[in-house]
Amino acid sequence: MKFIVKPHPEIFVKSESVRKRFTKILESNIRIIVKARTQGVAVFNRRDHIEVTSNSDTYYAEVLEILTTTPGIQQVLEVQQSSFTDLHNIYEQVLELNRANLENKTFVVRAKRRGKHDFTSIELERYVGGGLNQAIASAKVKLINPDVTVQVEVVDELLNQVIARHKGLGGFPLGTQEDVLSLISGGFDSGVSSYLHIKRGSKVHYCFFNLGGPAHEIGVKQTAYYLWQKYGSSAKVRFIAIDFAPVVAEILEKIDDGQMGVVLKRMFMRTAGMVAEKFGIQALVTGEALGQVSSQTLTNLRHIDNVTDTLILRPLINWDKEDIIRLAREIGTEDFAKTMPEFCGVISKSPTVKAVKEKLEEEEAKFDFALLDQVVYNARQIDIRDIGKESLEKAPEVELVNSAEEGNAVVLDIRSPDEEDESPLEIVGVEVKHLPFYKLATQFGDLDQSKTYLLYCSRGVMSRLQALYLQEQGFNNVKVYRP
C-alpha cells in the first residue's frame, strides 16, 4: 500500500522557510493520526509531497479516510506497487494499466527513479512512451499540455504507478494558524463554522453555553467530538461547558423583553472572551450569518462585538442557510443538527432588530455581572479525547457487555449507513438491527420496549454517549455492546 500526498498549493507560494514548516507540521499531523489508528504504516516527507506506505493493505480504507479528511492536503494519489524484471517489463505493466485510459488521447510519460538501475529516468520515459505510442494506435504523444500524464516511479526493485486520485480537504495543516474558541450549540451553523476554521489550520477549542440541561450537553459533545475525531484528531483541544441557566434566569427577570436577545448574545461574548483570555486564545468563532435572526443585523452585531476586546470571527456571515446545510451534510454534522433543540430563540417574544446602545446599557445596569465571574469559575473543561471516558464515569449505570447472548437482547448497530454497508455486523443467533445514531432521538421509542438494546459502534464512544442520552430520556433498557 502506498499513497502520495500532495499538499495544498497555497503552501507552496509561501517563503521557503514557511513552506518547510507547514509541510513538516502536515507530516507530523498525518503521523500522529496514523499511529493512533493503524499499525505498521510509515510516513515520509519528500519535500514536494508526503508518502504514506505499508507492506500490507490491512489499513487501506482507514489510511485513505485519514488522508482525505486531514486539513492541508490537496490531493491523495493512490499508488499500485509491483516488482519488475527489466525496462520492457515496466512498459508492459504500464500498458496494461493505462491502455483504456489513453484511447483517443494525447499523453506524456513522466518518470522518477531512485536506486541503482541500468537505465536513466529519461530513458525510462522514452522507452515507455514510445511503446505506448506504438501499441495504442489512437493515442498520440504530446509533451506540453497533454490530455493524460502517465506517472511512473521506480524505487529500487519496485514499480509504482498512480491508479486513483482522491480529493483532499485543502486548507492549511492543523496548527499552522493560531487557536480559536468556537461557540458551539450543536446546530447547523456552529458545526460548519468550526469545521471551516479546522480546515484553515486553526486548533478549534469548543465553548458550550448550556441552556438545555444534560441532554443538550450530551448532544453538543457528540458534535464536537465528531468534528475533532473526523477532521482534527492530531490536535489536543478543550471542550468547555458553562452552565448559563443562572444568566438566562437573570435576563428573564430583569431585562426588557425586546432587548433580551441582544443582551444574551452580549453575555455570551463577554463570557467567551473571559474564557479565551484565560487560555490564551486569540479569537472567538460563531456561526452567525447576516440577517438570519433578529440579533444578527449589522447594528446588533456591532453592539454585540463591542463588549469584548477578543476578535470575533464569523466565517458564515454572508452564507445562505441552504448552503450551510449542504456543507453540514457533506462534512457529516447535518444529522446531529437536525435532532438538536434550539433554546436561544425562545427567550424574547418581540426582539429588537436595531438595538440602541444607551438602551442596552440601561437594561444591563440591572444585571448582576458577578454571575459571569461565577459561571466562568464553575465552568467544566475537559480534553476532548476524554469525552468518551467522562460519559462512562458520569453514567456508571450504563452497563458495558461483551457478549450478546441475552435471550431478550437486540444488538442495535448505531453506525452510519456507509459504515454499516462497508462492514456489516452479523452475530450468529442474535438479532441485529440497524438504526443510525442520529435517528435514535426520534425513533428509539418506536422499538419494542420489552426488549433490551445493546448499542454498538466502531470505537464505543458514540454508543456510550447515546446510551447516556437515552437514559436521560427515561429509557432504561439500553446497554453498550463492546465485543
Curated annotation (Swiss-Prot):
What is the top-level taxon of the source organism?
Bacteria
Q: Which residues form a coiled coil?
A: none
Q: Which Pfam families match?
A: Rhodanese (PF00581), ThiI (PF02568), ThiI_fer (PF22025), THUMP (PF02926)
In this chain the THUMP domain maps to 61-165
Family matches, as PROSITE patterns: RHODANESE_3, THUMP
Subcellular location(s) of the protein = Cytoplasm
CDD domains recorded: PPase_ThiI, RHOD, THUMP_ThiI
> NCBIfam families this protein is in?
ThiI_C_thiazole (TIGR04271), tRNA uracil 4-sulfurtransferase ThiI (TIGR00342)
User: Function, please?
Assistant: Catalyzes the ATP-dependent transfer of a sulfur to tRNA to produce 4-thiouridine in position 8 of tRNAs, which functions as a near-UV photosensor. Also catalyzes the transfer of sulfur to the sulfur carrier protein ThiS, forming ThiS-thiocarboxylate. This is a step in the synthesis of thiazole, in the thiamine biosynthesis pathway. The sulfur is donated as persulfide by IscS.
Q: What is this protein called?
A: tRNA sulfurtransferase
Which species does this protein come from?
Vibrio cholerae serotype O1 (strain ATCC 39315 / El Tor Inaba N16961)
Q: Which gene encodes it?
A: thiI
